[in-house]
Amino acid sequence: MSEMIYGIHAVQALLERAPERFQEVFILKGREDKRLLPLIHALESQGVVIQLANRQYLDEKSDGAVHQGIIARVKPGRQYQENDLPDLIALHDRPFLLILDGVTDPHNLGACLRSADAAGVHAVIVPKDRSAQLNATAKKVACGAAESVPLIRVTNLARTMRMLQEENIWIVGTAGEADHTLYQSKMPGRMALVMGAEGEGMRRLTREHCDELISIPMAGSVSSLNVSVATGICLFEAVRQRT
């Protein structure tokens, strides 16, 4: 069993963390890229089989996405399960979690993972039935974060949120109609931030299981932000409060 990843950052990140997962790598024939050459040398030093391929082959393997001239066939990584969450929480005095409810675009999932990694989030939680898959597109956008931030898929998000509350984790949800803003919130301790789908927001049951609702103040004419942008804003306000 194998999966495909593509893009310089995604391949580089996996090489640094788990070189044993590589099976073979395809490089665009004739491409001379100063960012690509050191990566090729590093792959070769690990004994990874590298093959030259034309653009049509790479485009087909990546479903027409921007692959930057490199695609790798790799062994699947660790799949975190719902029952891994208590152990992950126990590793930290102040767990910092991100919950994504209804983020179904892999580009947005990848961007949220990238922001989560940069902010020091310990795990990202998504529902099994309303979430994008962690596919090659999401991994490329994540720029390596998909290999460092545990992504946990849960069967029942509301039940998981209740479990988090039993672990004394404060759950902060984002909603446009919240009565106070992100900058009036208190997020210094054990917490989980909940982000809903762009436009739709959180589902009703998810909203009802939040301990606090906050909004991002908007000064312009647009009514909402892309979920990955909003996630970055909220995460780094939490980081500011936690440091």
UniProtKB/Swiss-Prot annotation:
Principal place of residence: cytoplasm
CDD domains, alphabetized: SpoU-like_RlmB (cd18103)
Name of the top EC class for this enzyme: transferase
Pfam families associated with the record: SpoU_methylase, SpoU_sub_bind
Gene Ontology CC: cytosol
Amino-acid biosynthesis as UniProt keyword: no
GO molecular function annotations of the record: RNA binding; rRNA (guanosine-2'-O-)-methyltransferase activity
Catalytic activity: guanosine(2251) in 23S rRNA + S-adenosyl-L-methionine = 2'-O-methylguanosine(2251) in 23S rRNA + S-adenosyl-L-homocysteine + H(+)
EC numbers, comma separated: 2.1.1.185
InterPro entries xrefs: 23S_rRNA_MeTrfase_RlmB (IPR024915), Alpha/beta_knot_MTases (IPR029028), Ribosomal_eL30-like_sf (IPR029064), rRNA_MeTrfase_TrmH (IPR004441), SpoU_MeTrfase (IPR001537), SpoU_subst-bd (IPR013123), tRNA_m1G_MTases_N (IPR029026)
Keywords: Cytoplasm, Methyltransferase, rRNA processing, S-adenosyl-L-methionine, Transferase
Localization terms from the record: Cytoplasm
Superkingdom of origin organism: Bacteria
Binding-site residues, S-adenosyl-L-methionine: 196, 216, 225
Entries under HAMAP family matching the protein: 23SrRNA_methyltr_B
UniProt subunit comment: Homodimer.
Functional description taken from the UniProt entry: Specifically methylates the ribose of guanosine 2251 in 23S rRNA.
Family: Belongs to the class IV-like SAM-binding methyltransferase superfamily. RNA methyltransferase TrmH family. RlmB subfamily.
Protein name: 23S rRNA (guanosine-2'-O-)-methyltransferase RlmB
